[in-house]
Each structure stands twice: as structure tokens, then as C-alpha cells.
Amino acid sequence: MIIPKEILSLVEQVSPESWGEIYPKLFAALVEYGLTRVETELVLRATAKRLGVSYAQVWADWQTYLGHDPKGAKPRASDHLRELLEVEEYEVWRSPGNEVWVSVRLNGHVEHWPVRSARTEAWLRRLYGQVYKRLAPKVAVEDVMADLRATGLLFGDVHPVFTRLGGWKEEETGERRVYLDLGRPDWTVVEVTAEGWRVIPASEAPVRFYRNEYQRPLPVPERGGSLEPLWDLLPLQGERDRLLVLGWLLGSLNPWGPYPVLILSGEKGAGKSTAGEILKRLLDPTKAPRRSEPENEGDIVIAAQNNLVLLYDNLSQISPKISDAFCRLSTGGGFSKRKLYTDDSEVVLEAQRPVILTGIGFGAIRDDLADRTIRVELTRIADEDRVTDSQLWARFHREHPRILGALLDAASVALRRFDETEGELEAVVKGWYP
């Protein structure tokens, strides 16, 4: 949908003072260019917003200009729904990939959803049902969602969308801040700066988080935390492996990447799957955290859109195509995905995510992936040291706030020294090995 530049220019000139002069030119242009109904309504709504009046008033002027009786036509359900939106507090915008989003204030906090989503549809149906006490017609909801999408594409500001972890950089000072969405019902996030960290309402953060139904909440981190409980939970071989795991965890809290791929290997009984799940749950608890080997890039794209940390469990080998995808997740790259509701259009998604791979042996790993990996060999847990799953996870949940607090302390130090440590991933990874 493309609105002619002449019409957009006229809309930009609209004000209460200029309306008497502008509206004949604007309405004549609408007739001349033969805009569709949706395009015309979009222009009229933008005009009403600039005038500070209701859409109904501008629509009546338009009908009068056309020689129609503005009171003659019976309003449709979609018109009723549009009128309800005029008094709602919401914002339509788009992501860098041109996906249109809507931000809605609900119960004292703001949520961000794709316009084409079940949540947006449910919000519109609720607005309609609260007033008219009946179910909104499907066509009315679809019409209004199409309006929202057109508005976002043509007039929406561009904002990045983050899942669980987001980064912000001040243009003038170069100051970097990290935001971690706790995923809690109170809609709080952790703000990490070079001076420390604090828990704040998500509405005070300059980044926009998307929450999905798979995410689970993080605990509120404790100050004065410690990493010692983490080392008690993981069957690591010594100080070297602790430094490697700590480096990977801190790297995972860097929103700008890149991210080394962590490989956890070891003989049967070394607790590889559990160790991988512990590391994922530390930063990104989700429903069903362990994933089997992806069959194609599409599986990886979906996982990257809904997770911060990707845990692929019990792999035996990695195909060349999947190996290449893991490389792109590590250092950044595009993933092609067919655009919804089209036959041949594609959208390219940029994705970088921390990845954990577990397995007894992966066979030969291609050099480009090997250059991006950190390998940690876990020790077999002695029979006398084994505990039940319920005991292990009870310990984890008890210590989780302390461990998370310690990681955030370390992340703050990393921000203070960000410019000193920034460099090529290969050099960083190799530097971690003695």
C-alpha cells in the first residue's frame, strides 16, 4: 500500500487553522488518485489526528464533499471499533524488519504485540465486547487490524524488538546499558550500567520487550550474590572450566554479541543435559527448555524469535547446513523466511543468540563452527554424589537469586571495561583457552 506523496504532503499541512483551505485540495486529491476504501480511511484518520477531532467528523466532511448524506449510511461494526480505538491509549510502530507492532497499556503496564497476532485480535474483540455486549464480527476485526498495519507501515516509528535481553547505547556519550526482562507479573526489568544494576518498571526502560507464552519468570536478583553455588551444581573439572563457563554466561548477557557456542560433552552419566538446562534457566527459563536437533533453518528461526538461549540436547552429529546456521547465530547473519500471506515474498531476519550443545560425541565439526565454540568436558558424577531431580532443582531455585545477582555484578564490571574487551570472536575464544 503506497499513499501518493501529494496526499501525504497535504496531510502534513493540516491544522485546525488551515483546514478550511486544505480540505478541498485534500479531498480532490483523494478522488483524483482513486484510493481504496482502506487507504482513504487511513488518510482521513491521520487528518483527524492532526485536527484533534474525531474520525467521524472528518468522515462527515468527506461524505458532504462527495455529495452524500453523512447521516444516511448505517455505521458498520468496523466503524464502531475504530471509534473505540480513538479513546484508547496505544501506539502503532514497526520493527527494523518492517513487522508492524502495537503497544497497549493494560493494568498499569505496557505490552508490545505483533499486529498480526492472537493477542491483538483478543484486545480488539475485548474493546468491542465491553461496549456492545456482543462478539465483534470477524471481518470488522480483520479490517481494523489491516488499518493498524497500514498505519504502522506508512507512519510508524522504527524500534528494535527484544526477547528477554536488550541493549541501549547513548548516541552522544556512547554509554551502554543492558536490560534483562525478568518476565514477572509486575512487569519489571533489570537495568545494568557501568555503575551497577537496579530493578525498574519495564515502562521506564528505553527498549521494547516481547513476551511469549513459552517464557517463565526469573527471580528477583539478590545483591551481594555469589557464583559458588553454581559451581556446586555443575560437574566441572577445575578452575579453567569455571572460567570458560563464566565467560560464556557473561557473553550471553551482552546484547550486542557475538556469542561463542558452548559445547558440553562427556561420558554417559556426566549430567550434560542437566548442566545445559541449569545454564539456560539461569538467564532464560522457558517451557520445555531442551530442544532436539533442528531439522532445518526454519526450526532455528522460530526458536531464536522466542528464546534468548537455545539449548540443543543430546546431539550425535551436526549437518553442514545446521552447522552454518549455528555459525550465523554465533556471530550474526540473516535467515530467510517466507513472508506470511504472500506466495513468493521473503523476509530476512537478523539473529544472534547464545547456543548450548550437549552430546557424548559430535564427530567432526566443521572448522568455521569449531572456531566459534567453547568446549567443556564434564566429569562423570560418582554414584555417592548423585541426588534426585527434585533435590537438585530445589537447590537451584534456592540459589538462583544469588547466582543471578553475582552475574549482574560481573556484567556491570564488563560494561565499565567494554571498550577494552571488544574484539573479534575468534581471538576472544582462543584467548580463553590456556
List the model feature ranges, each with a label.
Residues 1-223, 302, 409, 413-417:
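N-terminal nucleic-acid engagement/recognition segments and initiation subdomains in replication
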Residues 17-21, 34-39, 72-75, 234-244, ...:
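Structural motif
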Residues 42-45, 94-97, 243-247, 263, ...:
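Short coil/turn segments at secondary-structure boundaries
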Residues 43, 112, 249, 273, ...:
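Conserved RecA-like P-loop NTPase ATPase core
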Residues 106, 194-306, 420, 432:
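P-loop NTPase catalytic core of nucleic-acid-dependent motor ATPases
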Residues 257-260, 286-292, 297-309, 315-322, ...:
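Feature primarily recognizes SF3-like P-loop helicase cores of small DNA viruses
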Residues 328-336:
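AAA+ P-loop NTPase catalytic core and its hallmark functional loops
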